[in-house]
Amino acid sequence: MTDDSEVPRIVSASREIAAAADEIFELIADPAQQPRWDGNDNLAEAPAGQRVRKVGEVFAMTTTKGHIRENHIVEFEEGRRIAWLPAEPASEPPGHLWRWELEPVDAARTRVTHTYDWSRLTDENRLPRARATTPAKLQASIDRLAAIAEG
């Protein structure tokens, strides 16, 4: 087993995007849009009509390996913050969290921060993938999101 004492269990990346926070948030809060900007190249598709609006909602996503994930919304502030815990269908989340935070710089620019927190991950089978989720992969998602939002 790998010693995780030197591996950060909370990683993040951030940058300014030349778009309004509300426009960027729509791309994040609508799961059907997520495969377009996923820097991990892990998301294949999500059914339309799952736009997230509050804590407690669950949206389904299919991975590129054909697995379905149910994502449980645990943080939500319209236009500013959204976070979810992925899980196998009809299972409790194993404890890793994806968070997006948007801070308007002005009406046309937004600081976007993307965080992956696996400090409470209990599923040992997921540890290798968690360790492989680096700030560079999170930055890739932000950069792809920026290309869409600024396009």
Label each residue range with its predicted role:
Residues 88-140:
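Beta-strand/loop substructures that line and gate deep hydrophobic ligand-binding cavities in soluble
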Residues 7-9, 65, 94, 108:
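Residue-level preference for beta-strand/loop junctions
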Residues 16, 45-91, 111, 147-151:
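Glycine-rich portal/gate segments that line the openings of hydrophobic small-molecule binding cavities
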Residues 13-15, 69-75, 96-104:
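Hydrophobic/aromatic beta-strand elements that line small-molecule binding cavities or substrate pockets
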Residues 21-22, 74-79, 101-111:
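A short, structured loop/turn motif at beta-sheet edges
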Residues 1-50:
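Hydrophobic ligand-binding cavity/cleft-lining segments
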